[in-house]
Amino acid sequence: MPQTKHPLPDTQLLTPGTLSRLTARSPSAHKGQFGHLLLIGGDRGFGGAALLCAESALRSGAGMVSLATRREHVPAALARVPEVMALGTDSANQLMGLLEQASVIVAGPGLGQAAWGRSLLSAAANAPRPQVWDADALNLLAKGGLSLPSGSVITPHPGEAARLLGISTAQVQADRPAAVRALSKKYTVVAVLKGAGSLIASPDGRLSRCDRGHPAMATAGLGDVLAGLVGALLAQGLPAFDSACLAVWLHAVAGEHQGKLGRGLAASDLIPAIRQLLEEQSPCLK
């Protein structure tokens, strides 16, 4: 697995004491105060990625979660997470109302790189909202012609990072700090370079490292859960860099807790663990 375990200059290690916290909620709080997250993803055959991301966002505290996906995935979404507002979406025109309502957009889980995914992502890119791009949104970004609004986050693994930078995966791995900084500078976003020893870089030069996690986390769907978590923290008012750092730490520590059972960890196992850790770190009530 990718490694960033050795000491790095000018890098802050993520610990409970260095992480930002969500503010406690007023007894009179309502859902509109905690953001409306729109998730765009789930092309044919990849609905599970979108559902994992949507459930993660909901369970991490977003006030409302909408899902724009292929219409054949809507029944599964309603059955698994009825609290998520799932809309069968055939074209970018159907996104326009949702884009206006959303406060945060997450794009990429199960999106695919065919015409459907490209058109939806192009529409999202034009919305002046903080965004989280993962998976195929990053592969489409690497092809050019798209940019992200300010206050956004990208979450590539080393292969995606290599495509975004136009270099080899080996070159990314040879100097991960330089790679994540280059990503942040090139796209003017907060960049998360995933892997053992995940790194988070911001355009203003900050760099943080997470040394938590477990090898049982080497399984599909973990990135979808992370993307939903980052989006939920953004929706609740944390700045992009703080959201990314807190999300990476919560995700890794949840993986440690669930990884104690060994092989067979499923991405969905992390969601209740993340919820518990978030409550311990940022209590809902004072």
Predicted region positions:
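Small-residue (G/A/S/T)-rich helix-start motifs and N-terminal tracts that mark the onset
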Residues: 1-132, 139-153, 158, 162-286
